[in-house]
Protein backbone atom coordinates (compact mmCIF):
# COMPACT_ATOMS: atom_id res chain seq x y z
CA UNK A 1 0.00 0.00 0.00
CA UNK A 2 1.18 3.51 -0.82
CA UNK A 3 0.03 6.24 1.55
CA UNK A 4 0.29 10.01 1.10
CA UNK A 5 0.40 11.96 4.36
CA UNK A 6 -0.06 15.72 4.61
CA UNK A 7 -1.32 18.26 7.15
CA UNK A 8 -1.80 21.97 7.80
CA UNK A 9 0.35 22.32 10.93
CA UNK A 10 3.53 22.05 8.89
CA UNK A 11 6.04 19.40 7.94
CA UNK A 12 7.83 19.66 11.31
CA UNK A 13 4.70 19.31 13.45
CA UNK A 14 4.77 16.41 15.93
CA UNK A 15 1.47 14.94 14.77
CA UNK A 16 2.57 14.25 11.20
CA UNK A 17 5.70 12.38 12.28
CA UNK A 18 3.79 10.13 14.68
CA UNK A 19 1.13 9.48 12.04
CA UNK A 20 3.65 8.67 9.32
CA UNK A 21 5.59 6.32 11.60
CA UNK A 22 2.44 4.39 12.54
CA UNK A 23 1.21 4.12 8.96
CA UNK A 24 4.63 2.97 7.75
CA UNK A 25 3.82 -0.48 9.15
CA UNK A 26 1.16 -0.78 6.42
CA UNK A 27 3.30 0.11 3.43
CA UNK A 28 5.21 2.94 1.78
CA UNK A 29 4.49 6.36 3.26
CA UNK A 30 5.31 9.64 1.53
CA UNK A 31 5.00 12.88 3.48
CA UNK A 32 4.33 16.06 1.48
CA UNK A 33 3.39 18.95 3.75
CA UNK A 34 3.61 22.74 4.09
CA UNK A 35 6.92 24.25 5.17
CA UNK A 36 5.16 26.12 7.99
CA UNK A 37 1.88 26.23 9.84
CA UNK A 38 -0.94 26.86 7.37
CA UNK A 39 -3.90 26.34 9.69
CA UNK A 40 -7.07 27.93 8.33
CA UNK A 41 -5.88 27.75 4.72
CA UNK A 42 -9.00 25.83 3.71
CA UNK A 43 -9.02 24.68 0.06
CA UNK A 44 -6.81 27.46 -1.28
CA UNK A 45 -4.45 26.76 -4.18
CA UNK A 46 -1.40 28.85 -5.07
CA UNK A 47 -2.00 30.12 -8.61
CA UNK A 48 0.13 33.26 -8.93
CA UNK A 49 3.60 31.88 -8.21
CA UNK A 50 5.50 28.59 -8.54
CA UNK A 51 5.79 26.10 -5.71
CA UNK A 52 9.17 25.15 -4.32
CA UNK A 53 9.82 21.73 -2.81
CA UNK A 54 12.65 20.74 -0.49
CA UNK A 55 13.35 17.18 0.63
CA UNK A 56 14.36 17.07 4.29
CA UNK A 57 16.91 14.73 5.85
CA UNK A 58 14.11 12.43 7.05
CA UNK A 59 12.76 12.06 3.50
CA UNK A 60 9.74 14.31 4.00
CA UNK A 61 8.93 16.85 1.29
CA UNK A 62 8.49 20.45 2.46
CA UNK A 63 6.40 22.69 0.18
CA UNK A 64 6.11 26.48 0.33
CA UNK A 65 2.37 26.26 -0.26
CA UNK A 66 -0.96 25.34 1.26
CA UNK A 67 -2.14 21.87 2.32
CA UNK A 68 -4.21 21.66 -0.86
CA UNK A 69 -1.13 22.61 -2.89
CA UNK A 70 0.78 19.77 -1.26
CA UNK A 71 -1.75 17.07 -2.10
CA UNK A 72 -2.42 18.47 -5.57
CA UNK A 73 1.30 18.56 -6.31
CA UNK A 74 1.87 15.05 -4.98
CA UNK A 75 -0.97 13.47 -6.94
CA UNK A 76 -0.63 15.26 -10.28
CA UNK A 77 2.92 14.37 -11.22
CA UNK A 78 5.35 14.96 -8.37
CA UNK A 79 5.09 11.50 -6.81
CA UNK A 80 5.47 8.33 -8.85
CA UNK A 81 3.81 5.92 -8.44
CA UNK A 82 0.66 7.59 -7.20
CA UNK A 83 -0.66 6.86 -3.70
CA UNK A 84 -3.55 4.56 -2.83
CA UNK A 85 -4.97 6.71 -0.03
CA UNK A 86 -4.50 10.17 1.51
CA UNK A 87 -4.35 10.72 5.27
CA UNK A 88 -4.22 14.30 6.57
CA UNK A 89 -3.13 15.09 10.12
CA UNK A 90 -2.70 14.57 12.93
CA UNK A 91 -4.04 18.08 13.51
CA UNK A 92 -3.17 19.81 16.77
CA UNK A 93 -6.69 20.85 17.69
CA UNK A 94 -10.29 20.09 16.83
CA UNK A 95 -11.96 20.21 13.45
CA UNK A 96 -15.54 20.01 14.65
CA UNK A 97 -18.72 21.47 13.21
CA UNK A 98 -18.15 24.65 11.22
CA UNK A 99 -14.37 24.26 11.62
CA UNK A 100 -14.33 22.07 8.52
CA UNK A 101 -15.05 25.13 6.34
CA UNK A 102 -11.69 26.66 7.25
CA UNK A 103 -9.56 23.62 8.04
CA UNK A 104 -6.48 22.97 5.95
CA UNK A 105 -6.41 19.47 7.43
CA UNK A 106 -9.85 18.68 6.03
CA UNK A 107 -9.02 20.47 2.76
CA UNK A 108 -5.98 18.27 2.16
CA UNK A 109 -8.17 15.18 2.48
CA UNK A 110 -10.79 16.74 0.20
CA UNK A 111 -8.17 17.38 -2.47
CA UNK A 112 -7.16 13.75 -2.31
CA UNK A 113 -10.76 12.67 -2.76
CA UNK A 114 -11.27 15.20 -5.55
CA UNK A 115 -8.34 13.60 -7.34
CA UNK A 116 -9.86 10.16 -6.98
CA UNK A 117 -8.41 8.65 -3.81
CA UNK A 118 -10.03 7.63 -0.53
CA UNK A 119 -9.09 10.14 2.14
CA UNK A 120 -9.16 10.69 5.89
CA UNK A 121 -8.66 13.87 7.93
CA UNK A 122 -7.75 13.23 11.56
CA UNK A 123 -7.50 15.74 14.41
CA UNK A 124 -6.85 15.71 18.15
CA UNK A 125 -9.24 17.63 20.38
CA UNK A 126 -7.65 19.44 23.30
CA UNK A 127 -4.96 21.89 24.32
CA UNK A 128 -1.29 20.94 24.69
CA UNK A 129 -1.89 17.59 23.00
CA UNK A 130 -0.31 14.62 24.77
CA UNK A 131 -1.67 11.49 23.07
CA UNK A 132 -1.01 11.73 19.34
CA UNK A 133 -0.35 7.99 19.38
CA UNK A 134 -4.04 7.38 20.10
CA UNK A 135 -5.07 9.13 16.89
CA UNK A 136 -2.29 7.45 14.92
CA UNK A 137 -3.46 3.98 15.93
CA UNK A 138 -7.07 4.85 15.07
CA UNK A 139 -5.97 6.25 11.70
CA UNK A 140 -4.11 3.03 10.98
CA UNK A 141 -7.18 0.92 11.73
CA UNK A 142 -9.33 3.11 9.49
CA UNK A 143 -6.85 2.82 6.63
CA UNK A 144 -6.95 -0.97 6.98
CA UNK A 145 -10.75 -0.92 6.86
CA UNK A 146 -10.91 1.43 3.88
CA UNK A 147 -8.44 -0.66 1.91
CA UNK A 148 -11.01 -3.46 1.93
CA UNK A 149 -14.21 -1.39 2.02
CA UNK A 150 -14.11 1.58 -0.32
CA UNK A 151 -15.84 4.84 0.53
CA UNK A 152 -18.48 6.17 -1.87
CA UNK A 153 -17.17 8.63 -4.42
CA UNK A 154 -16.79 12.26 -3.29
CA UNK A 155 -16.76 11.18 0.38
CA UNK A 156 -14.06 11.65 3.02
CA UNK A 157 -13.95 10.82 6.71
CA UNK A 158 -13.43 13.66 9.18
CA UNK A 159 -12.11 12.07 12.37
CA UNK A 160 -11.76 13.82 15.72
CA UNK A 161 -10.09 12.07 18.65
CA UNK A 162 -10.16 13.08 22.33
CA UNK A 163 -6.73 13.72 23.79
CA UNK A 164 -6.79 10.56 25.90
CA UNK A 165 -4.81 7.34 26.19
CA UNK A 166 -6.19 4.67 23.88
CA UNK A 167 -7.36 2.67 26.88
CA UNK A 168 -9.67 5.52 27.91
CA UNK A 169 -11.38 5.92 24.52
CA UNK A 170 -14.98 4.73 24.89
CA UNK A 171 -15.47 3.77 21.27
CA UNK A 172 -16.07 5.14 17.79
CA UNK A 173 -19.25 6.99 16.79
CA UNK A 174 -20.53 7.98 13.38
CA UNK A 175 -21.66 11.58 13.76
CA UNK A 176 -23.01 14.61 11.94
CA UNK A 177 -21.42 18.02 12.04
CA UNK A 178 -22.57 20.21 14.88
CA UNK A 179 -22.48 23.99 14.66
CA UNK A 180 -20.87 26.87 16.51
CA UNK A 181 -22.16 30.32 17.36
CA UNK A 182 -20.68 33.15 15.32
CA UNK A 183 -16.99 33.84 15.83
CA UNK A 184 -15.89 36.27 18.51
CA UNK A 185 -15.12 39.86 17.38
CA UNK A 186 -11.77 40.74 15.88
CA UNK A 187 -9.01 41.83 18.25
CA UNK A 188 -7.57 45.26 17.49
CA UNK A 189 -4.03 46.15 18.54
CA UNK A 190 -1.37 48.61 17.43
CA UNK A 191 2.06 48.04 15.96
CA UNK A 192 5.16 49.91 17.27
CA UNK A 193 4.44 52.77 14.86
CA UNK A 194 0.95 53.22 16.23
CA UNK A 195 -0.83 51.75 13.22
CA UNK A 196 -3.81 49.47 13.87
CA UNK A 197 -3.47 45.73 13.33
CA UNK A 198 -6.15 43.09 13.65
CA UNK A 199 -6.30 39.49 14.83
CA UNK A 200 -9.11 37.16 13.85
CA UNK A 201 -11.12 36.43 16.98
CA UNK A 202 -11.54 32.95 18.49
CA UNK A 203 -14.21 30.61 17.13
CA UNK A 204 -17.66 30.72 18.65
CA UNK A 205 -18.75 28.24 21.28
CA UNK A 206 -20.90 25.24 20.43
CA UNK A 207 -24.47 25.96 19.37
CA UNK A 208 -25.75 22.61 18.09
CA UNK A 209 -23.81 20.07 20.12
CA UNK A 210 -26.43 17.54 21.15
CA UNK A 211 -26.51 13.77 20.82
CA UNK A 212 -25.46 12.61 17.38
CA UNK A 213 -23.08 15.50 16.74
CA UNK A 214 -19.31 15.41 16.58
CA UNK A 215 -19.14 17.74 19.59
CA UNK A 216 -21.21 15.34 21.70
CA UNK A 217 -19.13 12.31 20.77
CA UNK A 218 -15.96 14.06 21.90
CA UNK A 219 -17.54 15.22 25.17
CA UNK A 220 -18.50 11.65 26.00
CA UNK A 221 -15.01 10.29 25.33
CA UNK A 222 -15.70 8.82 21.90
CA UNK A 223 -13.93 9.19 18.59
CA UNK A 224 -16.11 11.17 16.18
CA UNK A 225 -16.19 9.98 12.57
CA UNK A 226 -18.16 12.23 10.24
CA UNK A 227 -18.56 11.37 6.56
CA UNK A 228 -18.25 14.55 4.49
CA UNK A 229 -19.41 14.93 0.90
CA UNK A 230 -17.72 17.10 -1.71
CA UNK A 231 -20.97 17.83 -3.55
CA UNK A 232 -22.35 20.85 -1.69
CA UNK A 233 -25.51 21.17 -3.80
CA UNK A 234 -28.63 21.74 -1.64
CA UNK A 235 -30.95 19.43 -3.55
CA UNK A 236 -33.92 19.88 -1.21
CA UNK A 237 -34.09 23.55 -2.15
CA UNK A 238 -34.58 22.91 -5.88
CA UNK A 239 -38.40 23.04 -5.96
CA UNK A 240 -38.69 26.04 -3.66
CA UNK A 241 -36.02 27.97 -5.53
CA UNK A 242 -37.55 27.08 -8.91
CA UNK A 243 -40.93 28.41 -7.79
CA UNK A 244 -39.29 31.56 -6.50
CA UNK A 245 -37.43 32.14 -9.74
CA UNK A 246 -40.58 31.61 -11.79
CA UNK A 247 -41.92 34.77 -10.18
CA UNK A 248 -39.04 36.80 -11.56
CA UNK A 249 -39.81 38.45 -14.88
CA UNK A 250 -36.84 39.08 -17.13
CA UNK A 251 -37.71 41.37 -20.03
CA UNK A 252 -35.52 41.87 -23.08
Curated annotation (Swiss-Prot):
Coiled coil: none
Keywords of this entry: Cytoplasm, Hydrolase, Metal-binding, Nucleotide-binding
GO cellular component: cytoplasm
Residues annotated for a divalent metal cation binding in this entry: 8-9, 39, 91
Record's cofactor remark: Binds 1 divalent metal cation per subunit.
Principal localisation: cytoplasm
Cofactor: a divalent metal cation
InterPro entries: SurE, SurE-like_Pase/nucleotidase, SurE-like_sf
Compartments, as annotated in UniProt: Cytoplasm
Entry-linked Gene3D superfamilies: Survival protein SurE-like phosphatase/nucleotidase
Catalytic activity of the protein: a ribonucleoside 5'-phosphate + H2O = a ribonucleoside + phosphate
Recorded superkingdom: Bacteria
Top EC category: hydrolase
Record GO terms (molecular function): 3'-nucleotidase activity; 5'-nucleotidase activity; exopolyphosphatase activity; metal ion binding; nucleotide binding
EC number assigned by the record: 3.1.3.5
Role this protein plays: Nucleotidase that shows phosphatase activity on nucleoside 5'-monophosphates.
PANTHER family referenced in this protein's UniProt entry, alphabetically: 5'-NUCLEOTIDASE SURE, 5'_3'-NUCLEOTIDASE SURE
Similarity remark: Belongs to the SurE nucleotidase family.
Stated name of the protein: 5'-nucleotidase SurE
The organism's taxonomic lineage, starting at the top: Bacteria, Pseudomonadati, Pseudomonadota, Gammaproteobacteria, Legionellales
Amino acid sequence: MKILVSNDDGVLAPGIKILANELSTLGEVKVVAPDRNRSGASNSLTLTQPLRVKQLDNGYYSVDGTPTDCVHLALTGFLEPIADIVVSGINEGANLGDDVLYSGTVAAAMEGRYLGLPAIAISMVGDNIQYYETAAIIAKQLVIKLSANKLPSQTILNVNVPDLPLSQIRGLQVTRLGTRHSAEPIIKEYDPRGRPIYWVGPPGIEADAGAGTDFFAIKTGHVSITPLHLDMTHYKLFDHLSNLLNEICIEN
